[in-house]
Amino acid sequence: MKLDITTLDGGSAGSVELNEAIYGLEPRADILQRMVRYQLAKRRAGTHAVKNRSDVDRTSKKLYKQKGTGNARHGAASAPQFRGGGRAFGPVVRDHSHDLPKKVRALALKHALSAKAKASTLIVVDDIKVDNHKTKAMIERFEKLGLSSALIIGGSEVDENFGRAARAIPKIDVLPVQGINVYDILRRDTLVLTRAAVDALEERFK
């Protein structure tokens, strides 16, 4: 698969041959969905908790004697049915993450890349180095490229000026190639890869 390489200013910088085994697969929604669920579950803090009947500050004394009052039988005031009582079966602190095989995770990334390539929303740029960190100038560059919602993947390190200029622009995310992931690819309309990112992904999936 051949794709034209563009510059940040919208010019041409040649072309690149993309590996069909990475960018030419038929996207499978089930694999992408499994990966997104895996990522979102893993990032959950899981710090939710409530007080059960052993945690609330109520006396454990029996409210009144068992028989002879005509009232229903009750024990401690900390029971869930009473105002101020403990919560029954409430959330507890726990880890929400679940396992997903490494091969499935790698395959999901290939399918996400292939989905962008198939939809013609994959752009390759030669480099993302800029001379200053002016956001206004960066917005003008993105308008030339037709980018309003994009994930931009740099090389092993993102140019500092580029990162500072782009971080204030809504719906524009910038990551080094090590940080590329399925969720961030799918949540933006366009995927922008640098030539260095293309080479790094090729090496990664060898």
UniProtKB/Swiss-Prot annotation:
Keyword annotations: Ribonucleoprotein, Ribosomal protein, RNA-binding, rRNA-binding
UniProt entry tagged with the keyword rRNA-binding: yes
Pfam families: Ribosomal_L4 (PF00573)
GO molecular function: rRNA binding; structural constituent of ribosome
Gene Ontology cellular-component terms listed: ribonucleoprotein complex; ribosome
GO biological process: translation
Cross-referenced Gene3D superfamilies: 3.40.1370.10
Range of residues in the leader sequence: none
This protein's record includes keyword Hydrolase: no
Entry's family note: Belongs to the universal ribosomal protein uL4 family.
Function statement: One of the primary rRNA binding proteins, this protein initially binds near the 5'-end of the 23S rRNA. It is important during the early stages of 50S assembly. It makes multiple contacts with different domains of the 23S rRNA in the assembled 50S subunit and ribosome.
Subunit field text: Part of the 50S ribosomal subunit.
UniProt protein name: Large ribosomal subunit protein uL4
